[in-house]
């Protein structure tokens, strides 16, 4: 990908997702006319955040850096309280903006801060991880973790723009690329099988941040999410398909005290959801096994602790998709044919979990 590509997210109001390299100039244009901008960044991105601050300052914008903790440790209420305090101290107003710089966790907490400060100000996401690029930055879902569960406190708040700078992927460790691939695989199974074909053709090429395959996978995954979000901005029905594999994944993350990477948990969750669909008579054997084969080829986990099901069941009952104590899962009725499974029998859940239980 040599020239920037723009994917329009047709929400109300709409916003662009710009995919390319060297997008600092685009950030300046997106924020043109703002008086103050707060740049929320994770510790390892201080140098990049300072470059953004300098660039915006040269354009006459009063820009400030706010450092937040890395990963899921940053998605907590005390961190949001700290952000609010700094926003108040530097005088960020309703016509100003926040820039989020970092992975999915930074995007989530910065988005929540933007949604709640002065009842909502603009935010521009600059995701620096693969997971952030294809999942957290697009769609307007924000949230923090509490003792009650992952992302149960949050808001819908669409960004003003998303800038995906592909050059940032080249400095990421391989395990970060691998983890982000789980959400791309999910997009392939629920809506765009070409994604799966591309990965199967050459898994190593799919993981190469300097090659041509990964940028196209990112673009396709963003298009899938953009189309679903535009059709169902507030997750009333269709958007639930984006939670394919996530019911078990969130339970695993909670059991692991958020020390597992989100992509790793989603990978196990995808295989579980596929097995659940198969055992319910809704998904064929070949597509079920294809989940396991593709995820394994990318180096993602497809099994979890055999004795964990009771704890995971307790967490899943607290999942935001649960209604009146009835568990609801996204399953497939075929490739790119997502559906819903409500209130499955506990024996069916146990049988599906047995297929991902680690020996």
Swiss-Prot record:
Quote any Pfam family the record assigns.
DHQ_synthase
Q: How is the cofactor bound?
A: Binds 1 divalent metal cation per subunit. Can use either Co(2+) or Zn(2+).
Record's InterPro entries? Dehydroquinate_synthase, DHQ_synth_AroB, DHQ_synth_fam, DHQS/DOIS_N, DHQS_C
Catalytic activity reported: 7-phospho-2-dehydro-3-deoxy-D-arabino-heptonate = 3-dehydroquinate + phosphate
Residues engaged in binding Zn(2+) = 183, 246, 262
Keyword Transmembrane helix tagged: no
- E.C. number: 4.2.3.4
Q: Name one GO molecular function term.
A: 3-dehydroquinate synthase activity
Q: Name one GO biological process term.
A: aromatic amino acid family biosynthetic process
Keywords, comma-separated and alphabetical? Amino-acid biosynthesis, Aromatic amino acid biosynthesis, Cobalt, Cytoplasm, Lyase, Metal-binding, NAD, Nucleotide-binding, Zinc
Give an example GO cellular component term for this record. cytoplasm
Q: Where in the cell is it found?
A: Cytoplasm
Give the pathway.
Metabolic intermediate biosynthesis; chorismate biosynthesis; chorismate from D-erythrose 4-phosphate and phosphoenolpyruvate: step 2/7
Quick one: where is this thing mainly located?
A: cytoplasm
Needed cofactors: Co(2+); Zn(2+); NAD(+)
Q: Which residues bind NAD(+)?
A: 70-75, 104-108, 128-129, 141, 150
Q: Which family does it belong to?
A: Belongs to the sugar phosphate cyclases superfamily. Dehydroquinate synthase family.
Function statement:
Catalyzes the conversion of 3-deoxy-D-arabino-heptulosonate 7-phosphate (DAHP) to dehydroquinate (DHQ).
The protein's name in its UniProt record: 3-dehydroquinate synthase
Source species of the chain: Mycolicibacterium gilvum (strain PYR-GCK)
Name of the gene encoding the protein in the UniProt record? aroB
